[in-house]
């Protein structure tokens, strides 16, 4: 990663665009697929790089910035549940200084002279949930989803042992929030069962819990050893108590499981002592934790602090350092992705780290092998922080055997044997043989049918590989003629190994169902390099319909300057991504394939809905000193209500809030005849919005 202090504005823009796409993909894999692609520590590093870039270049903040989002958009297989109060994620603290900064921000924001008590509790590594009770009866259970809309898992949550279905002496409407998890030993037992039944094993306890809870068949969920803790009252918590410690006491009285390991800290020293206690004893706990959560204990102060786009100001998560292990590097294999990128993967002697058996680790690129001087048969240090594929941190050179073997970077593609192309600025090696490369073609079809693309259930890795090997499909278009081909063939698919009448019927139904697709999903399904879900949405928003999209892309092939400029001006589409789009549509076969797909699919026009309020999109300027609230709190409230807060007055300004000692900005607002109100009027206004 580049040095943020030395980065230019142009480089920052490109990096922000890349980070937005990467983090969106990682969010989807983690929250929706229950299949994280990178370690927690690597994700945190990317996210913090994004934040630092935005702090240095605030004018470059993208519409699809990760700092504005929580989780990922929910899948289509569950009914949707809208959270009355968003289920946001927490900001992270990685060391004691970060925690001190968190405490200082509270003091400054609230204008406090003394330490405000902080409630400390373990950060459970599970799946967040919300449960709603009406007249004491459980009516709705939901996942976090994207923070605003989650998945309805009511039937599944009712199968969890000791989860209350009915409670007494509570308000007419009650919400609780918490974490659903699987204990370490239960996870090992579950994986043993999966292995004995020939099913894929779960990567870690969190994945197992998430996968179990997101089953369409609740009888499967009922067989899984799920447990839970509640830690919040959601929209109703302030009807139950005035502080976090009182709330947990009340929820326990109602019959909910709460985590008894907690601490109400009265100083920074007490915070750090509790953190060290948990860090030292985490391996002795029956469940996985990945840090400690700190919250302002007082709900009145929490309300005043409020939220930023994706997290509350009044809470943070102090993360534990990653778990380190050591094992032997047995070999290095190479994978070819759908865009031709070659990725080396370390094959390891299996090792258990934090209750999970690890046998593979990502090496990211071939330069990393040389930089770390990795050799086959070396003993390597492995880092795991709740991830699926951990990261190799380095070599134990003191234990290096005499018979180690260096790894030779391939010159030819392992799939199609074509000469490889090396791109120094991307630090990657690529096969440019496109769809003539079997590995790329396979991965492209796999991407096309994936959940967040065309979402064709029943076409997993094994099924796609089988259909290609049998010559039944060779490109995405063939999928939609599979039933027709099967009906006219003597060798029926349902009679072949691994298939059956029911599975084939379901597959054909799912293929037919997928023909109705939104424009953003369709664009994403095409597999254009660097066009993830967010950038696909940007393109869909710009062009509106499939017909306009394909027409404009054909113009792009003819070097039409207007369309080039239009794409170049899109926030989130930089020069690098634009080149990738041009390269994709320069291939005649790609245009032909898209047109044929457009002829058989119902591709819905792009639609976007936005909630409106009286302050939405209004430009507000604060000037002078405010007596009852801090400037930061006033700004946060305005943004929460949809306003855009500016630092200077211009003809575009809609409202000026003038405090004591307002000067030049107030004068200019009067000259421009802009509406001006004082602090008291502002407080009345926001109360009534």
Curated annotation (Swiss-Prot):
EC number(s) given by UniProt: 6.5.1.2
InterPro entries: BRCT_dom, BRCT_dom_sf, DisA/LigA_HHH, DNA_ligase, DNA_ligase_AS, DNA_ligase_CS, DNAligase_adenylation, DNAligase_N
A GO term from the CC aspect: cytosol
Amino-acid positions noted as binding Zn(2+) in the UniProt annotation, renumbered to this chain: 413, 416, 431, 437
A Pfam family recorded for this sequence: DNA_ligase_aden
Sequence ranges assigned to domain BRCT in this UniProt record: 610-689
Top-level division of the source organism's lineage: Bacteria
Annotated catalytic residues: 123 (n6-amp-lysine intermediate)
Cofactor(s) listed in the protein's UniProt record: Mg(2+); Mn(2+)
Residues binding NAD(+): 40-44, 89-90, 121, 144, 179, 295, 319
GO BP terms in the entry: DNA repair; DNA replication
Reactions mediated catalytically: NAD(+) + (deoxyribonucleotide)n-3'-hydroxyl + 5'-phospho-(deoxyribonucleotide)m = (deoxyribonucleotide)n+m + AMP + beta-nicotinamide D-nucleotide
GO terms assigned for molecular function: DNA ligase (NAD+) activity; metal ion binding
Top enzyme class: ligase
Keywords in alphabetical order: DNA damage, DNA repair, DNA replication, Ligase, Magnesium, Manganese, Metal-binding, NAD, Zinc
Family stated for the protein in its record: Belongs to the NAD-dependent DNA ligase family. LigA subfamily.
UniProt xrefs under NCBIfam families: dnlj, PRK07956.1
Purpose: DNA ligase that catalyzes the formation of phosphodiester linkages between 5'-phosphoryl and 3'-hydroxyl groups in double-stranded DNA using NAD as a coenzyme and as the energy source for the reaction. It is essential for DNA replication and repair of damaged DNA.
HAMAP family referenced in this protein's UniProt entry, alphabetically: DNA_ligase_A (MF_01588)
The name this protein goes by in its record: DNA ligase
Source species of the chain: Rickettsia africae (strain ESF-5)
């Amino acid at each position: 990663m580049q040095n943020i202090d030395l980065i230019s504005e142009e480089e920052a823009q490109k990096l922000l665009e890349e980070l937005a796409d990467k983090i969106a993909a990682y969010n989807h894999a983690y929250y929706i697929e229950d299949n994280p692609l990178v370690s927690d520590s690597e994700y945190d590093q990317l996210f913090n790089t994004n934040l630092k870039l935005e702090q240095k270049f605030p004018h470059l903040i993208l519409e699809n910035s990760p700092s504005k989002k929580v989780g990922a958009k929910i899948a289509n297989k569950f009914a949707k549940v809208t959270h009355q109060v968003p289920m946001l994620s927490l900001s992270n603290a990685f060391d004691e200084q970060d925690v001190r900064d968190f405490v200082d921000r509270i003091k400054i924001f609230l204008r406090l002279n003394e330490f405000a008590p902080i409630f400390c509790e373990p950060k459970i590594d599970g799946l967040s949930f919300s449960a709603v009770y009406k007249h004491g009866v459980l009516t709705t259970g939901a996942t976090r989803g994207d923070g605003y809309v989650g998945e309805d898992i009511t039937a599944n949550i009712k199968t969890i042992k000791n989860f209350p279905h009915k409670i007494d002496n509570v308000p007419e409407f009650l919400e609780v929030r918490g974490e659903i998890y699987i204990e370490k030993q239960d996870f090992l037992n579950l994986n043993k069962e999966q292995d004995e039944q020939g099913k894929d094993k779960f990567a870690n306890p969190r994945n197992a819990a998430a996968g179990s809870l997101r089953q369409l068949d609740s009888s499967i969920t009922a067989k899984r050893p799920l447990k839970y803790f509640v830690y919040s009252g959601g929209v109703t918590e302030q009807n139950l108590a005035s502080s976090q410690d009182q709330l947990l006491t009340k929820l326990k009285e109602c019959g909910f499981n709460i985590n008894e390991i907690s601490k109400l800290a009265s100083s920074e020293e007490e915070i750090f002592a509790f953190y060290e206690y948990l860090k030292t004893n985490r391996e002795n706990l029956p469940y996985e934790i990945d840090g400690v959560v700190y919250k302002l204990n007082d709900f009145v102060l929490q309300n005043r602090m409020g939220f930023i786009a994706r997290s509350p100001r009044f809470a943070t998560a102090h993360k534990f350092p990653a778990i380190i292990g050591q094992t032997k590097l047995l070999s290095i294999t190479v994978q070819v992705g759908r865009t031709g990128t070659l990725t080396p993967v370390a094959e390891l002697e299996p090792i258990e780290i934090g209750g999970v058996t690890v046998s593979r680790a990502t090496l990211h690129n071939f330069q990393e092998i040389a930089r770390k001087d990795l050799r086959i048969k070396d003993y390597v240090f492995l880092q795991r922080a709740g991830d699926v594929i951990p990261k190799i941190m380095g070599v134990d050179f003191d234990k290096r055997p005499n018979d180690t073997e260096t790894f030779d970077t391939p010159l030819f593609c392992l799939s199609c044997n074509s000469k490889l192309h090396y791109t120094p600025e991307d630090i990657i090696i690529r096969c440019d043989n496109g769809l003539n490369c079997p590995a790329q073609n396979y991965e492209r079809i796999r991407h096309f049918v994936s959940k967040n693309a065309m979402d064709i259930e029943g076409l997993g890795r094994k099924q796609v590989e089988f259909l290609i090997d049998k010559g039944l499909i060779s490109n995405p278009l063939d999928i939609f003629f599979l039933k027709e081909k099967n009906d006219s063939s003597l060798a029926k698919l349902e009679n072949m190994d691994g298939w059956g009448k029911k599975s084939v019927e379901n597959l054909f139904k799912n293929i037919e169902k997928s023909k109705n697709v939104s424009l953003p999903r369709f664009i994403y399904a095409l597999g254009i390099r660097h066009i993830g879900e967010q950038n696909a949405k940007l393109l869909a928003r710009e062009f509106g319909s499939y017909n306009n999209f394909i027409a404009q892309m054909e113009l792009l092939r003819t070097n039409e300057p207007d369309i080039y400029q239009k794409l170049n001006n899109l926030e989130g589409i930089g020069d690098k991504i634009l080149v990738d789009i041009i390269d994709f549509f320069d291939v005649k076969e790609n245009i032909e394939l898209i047109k044929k797909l457009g002829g058989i699919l119902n591709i819905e026009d792009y639609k976007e809905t936005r909630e409106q309020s009286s302050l939405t999109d209004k430009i507000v300027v604060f000037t002078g000193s405010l007596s009852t609230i801090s400037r930061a709190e006033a700004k946060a409230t305005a943004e929460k209500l949809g306003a855009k807060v500016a630092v200077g007055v211009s003809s575009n300004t809609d409202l000026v809030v003038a405090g004591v000692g307002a000067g030049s900005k107030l004068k200019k607002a009067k000259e421009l005849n802009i509406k001006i109100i004082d602090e008291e009027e502002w407080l009345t206004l926001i109360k009534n919005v």
